[in-house]
Regions:
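Non-catalytic, soluble scaffold/interaction modules
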Residues: 1-169
Length: 169
């Protein structure tokens, strides 16, 4: 358990640095208001209730930190997704965005949604896009996108509007 907790701590530090970098870039390109969206992402990393539950689940179920973090984060996301308020329901996407970053860092994977490989202007079709991925879109390469989930109040939609990228969410 101590090794798994140490790995989690390192992944949280790395994720925080990544989110701060996204926030900095968004602030430069879109302004402070849009960059403040990522304050909620940073708060997830500091949520003691969530982190304590991850520790408890690891100990009780004797599972890896990846499994425990994934299970707990998805439980929180489902809870948010079930709330009868559009704004709060959209925060489930934020939880999943942060969880994906943490899990990728635990697993040593590259950042999710890296579209630097696009060679020509494209329209992106996806089940979902996180706000942090959307914020990093190159307007010269991404002409627009469509997702199955989201709404006009989602952080992904806000990022698209700020970048002036047409989107159907």
């Amino acid at each position: 358990l101590p090794n798994e907790l140490q790995r989690l701590e390192q992944a949280l530090i790395q994720t925080r640095q990544q989110i701060l970098e996204v926030q900095r870039k968004v602030g430069e390109v879109m302004g402070a208001d849009d960059a403040s969206i990522f304050d909620a992402h940073l708060l997830v990393l500091e949520d003691r209730t969530l982190l304590d539950e991850v520790t408890r689940v690891m100990a009780q179920k004797r599972i890896s930190v990846e499994q425990a973090f994934g299970q707990v984060a998805e439980k929180y996301a489902k809870t948010l997704g079930a709330i009868d308020d559009d704004y709060l329901r959209e925060r489930a996407a934020d939880m999943r965005d942060v969880a994906a970053r943490v899990l990728n860092n635990l697993l040593g994977r590259h950042e999710p949604g890296d579209l630097k490989h696009l060679k020509e202007p494209s329209i992106i079709i996806s089940y979902d896009l996180s706000p942090s991925i959307t914020a990093m879109f190159d307007k010269k390469k991404v002409l627009g996108f469509a997702t199955d989930v989201g709404s006009k109040t989602s952080h992904t939609a806000i990022m698209a509007r700020s970048l002036q990228i047409p989107a159907v969410v």
